[in-house]
From Swiss-Prot:
Alphabetical list of InterPro entries matching this protein: Ribo_uL30_ferredoxin-like_sf (IPR036919), Ribosomal_uL30_bac-type (IPR005996), Ribosomal_uL30_ferredoxin-like (IPR016082)
Record keywords, A-Z: Ribonucleoprotein, Ribosomal protein
A Gene Ontology term for the protein's cellular component: cytosolic large ribosomal subunit
Descriptive protein name: Large ribosomal subunit protein uL30
Underlying gene: rpmD
A Gene Ontology molecular function term of the record: structural constituent of ribosome
NCBIfam families: rpmD_bact (TIGR01308)
Similarity-based family: Belongs to the universal ribosomal protein uL30 family.
Subunit and interaction comment: Part of the 50S ribosomal subunit.
Transmembrane regions listed in the UniProt entry: none
Native species: Marinobacter nauticus (strain ATCC 700491 / DSM 11845 / VT8) (Marinobacter aquaeolei)
Amino acid sequence: MANAKTIKVTLTRSPIGCQPKHKLCVKGLGLRKIGHTVEVEDTPSIRGMINRVNYLVRVEEN
């Protein structure tokens, strides 16, 4: 897993007022506060969560 491709995801907008499924995607990505950045593996399930909340996050590919 050391060679696994990773991506950095940063929460740029608050999920307050969003659909409950979108809030769960933000939580599933491990994001807590605005400006919080996490490094996650680049998998199809992670990409799906990012695509669902693309208006709330910024993505940086490594």
